[in-house]
Amino acid sequence: MEFLSKYTACLSNWGLNLEPGLQTVGAAVLLTTGSLFIASRVLTFVRVLLSLFVLPGKPLRSFGPKGSWAVVTGASDGLGKEFSLQLARAGFNIVLVSRTASKLTTLAEEITTKHSVQTKTLAMDFAANDDADYEELKAIVNGLDVAVLINNVGKSHDIPTPFALTPEDEMTDIVTINCLGTLRTTQLIIPGMMQRKRGLVLTMGSFGGLLPTPLLATYSGSKAFLQQWSTSLGSELEPYGITVELVQAYLITSAMSKVRRTSATIPDPRAFVKAVLSKIGRNGGSPGYAYSSSPYWSHGLMAWFLTCVMQPMGKLVVGQNKSMHEAIRKRALRKAEREKGKKST
């Protein structure tokens, strides 16, 4: 809308200030420019629709033969658990990495019971950033044909909180888990992929990395970092035949999002992971972001609108995002007060 108003004003000025012959030329130039701009937006939207609803992604078997392995971080719950189950169903052996050993054991048993694949587990707290943990992970994957890496481990704020009030340990954990944990794991896995000239490195991003998110500033910044890092990595590894993809996601029902009810815009992990794995290599709703995708249909449409129509870094979008998270914070604080009152009675 802002473009059209500027376009109209510019056209009016040309009409006022130029000779009649030049007015015609000027109007034609502006009309052509405007038409090309609108046509490019329409074509981009058509590409988005084709990517989301028609065109298939790369087959998972293109990343590794039967008997190859997938490493999944944050594997014990939510998206990580679902990635593990669906990759096992596709015939991959699974290395499960997460913090809680008992949950990993239960999931490993579920996978081997349902599917004829092998599993390995590692109970690892990414917040600790312990060299010994990474050495143990290296020992586990050494000699394995790791075809797929799912960087799913992540942490957000307990509730939306102004940066000045964010607890230091929460801030440190978010950066250590989301950024450093992802980098160290990836750097450990990709040499084998580079040797074999194939592989998939898939990292879970967030709309928080696309849109500055007040009251989730540290989390938003960590996901923006992953966006830039993953896109750069995609360019570096493409000559080795490795597909790198950052998945831009809106809300999904999970412990992290604290959303329990599904809707058109909030899928459950099963539906979301199915969309991700069926659209590898397709941009979905993120045509302007190389080596990135927003593959779930409603998330893709939102991502297209926010990045191709709106100005994601503009004050309007940031202000709306701030208002939304201020309201969420107020509700969370009221709920905490009610629960505190119940405990004291």
Swiss-Prot record:
It comes from Neosartorya fischeri (strain ATCC 1020 / DSM 3700 / CBS 544.65 / FGSC A1164 / JCM 1740 / NRRL 181 / WB 181). NADP(+) binds at V71, D125, D133, N152, Y219, K223, I252, S254. Keywords: Endoplasmic reticulum, Fatty acid biosynthesis, Fatty acid metabolism, Lipid biosynthesis, Lipid metabolism, Membrane, NADP, Oxidoreductase, Transmembrane, Transmembrane helix. It is found in: Endoplasmic reticulum membrane. Belongs to the short-chain dehydrogenases/reductases (SDR) family. PROSITE patterns: ADH_SHORT (PS00061). It is an enzyme of class 1 (oxidoreductase). The chain crosses the membrane at residues 26-46. It catalyses: a very-long-chain (3R)-3-hydroxyacyl-CoA + NADP(+) = a very-long-chain 3-oxoacyl-CoA + NADPH + H(+). Gene3D superfamilies: NAD(P)-binding Rossmann-like Domain. GO terms for cellular component: endoplasmic reticulum membrane. It is a single-pass membrane protein. This is Very-long-chain 3-oxoacyl-CoA reductase. Pathway: Lipid metabolism; fatty acid biosynthesis. InterPro entries: 3_ketoreductase_fungal (IPR027533), NAD(P)-bd_dom_sf (IPR036291), Sc_DH/Rdtase_CS (IPR020904), SDR_fam (IPR002347). GO terms for biological process: fatty acid elongation; secondary metabolite biosynthetic process; sphingolipid biosynthetic process; very long-chain fatty acid biosynthetic process.
